[in-house]
Amino acid sequence: MRLLIATIALALTSNLELNAQEAQINWLSIAEVTEAQKNEPRKVMMDVYTKWCGPCKMMMANTFTNEGLIEYVNKNYYCVKLDAEHPDPITFRGEEYTNPNYNPNSKGRNGVHQLSIALKVSAYPTIVYFDEEFNVIAPISGYKQPRQLQVLLTFFHDQFNSKTPQEEMQPLWDKYSSEFVGTW
């Protein structure tokens, strides 16, 4: 009887672990997003991180594993991870960006990728939000908990319009964020 109970418990635990492993953000490369935009335009969320960044690791473990967030971004956004110290060239909007100061022998921080600089990333983690044509909406730095990210994601998805004058966006954001009730 104990063996039967242990076997059932193990099977249930394995199934729960399998389900937890399946729920994850569908991270794409910039090239994959560029291609996907042709058939199904969406806004883009780009997580710019480094391997040595503690808050970046915390976001990966605590924020990007939230089931509500995963479901929302996989449905409404294309998601990209960009290592800001990545050594390889990246083509973005027809231009090639490199990391000319990358040192493969470096044990710690390394050269900053030109794409990270072009996107005005000055701290890690930074999430850069883009419209459907890969135009930057805003780079927003700092560790974000799921609810903090939810208000940004839903605002940019539901309220942002590139034709809205900048002076009208701040009052719109202030009102939206003050009335926002998170569900994650």
Model regions and ranges:
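Solvent-exposed loop/turn segments at secondary-structure junctions
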Residues: 50-55, 63, 84-89, 134-135
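Thiol-based oxidoreductase modules, predominantly thioredoxin-like and allied folds used
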Residues: 25-27, 69-107
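Typically the conserved alpha-helix immediately C-terminal to a functionally engaged Cys/Sec
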Residues: 57-74
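A short beta-strand-turn-helix
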Residues: 25-43, 73
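Bacterial Sec-dependent N-terminal signal peptides
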Residues: 1-22
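Short active-site neighborhood of thiol/selenol oxidoreductases, capturing the structured segment around
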Residues: 40-54, 79
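Structural micro-motif
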Residues: 43, 98-105, 113-128
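Non-globular targeting/processing and membrane-anchoring segments
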Residues: 21-23, 120, 131, 137-184
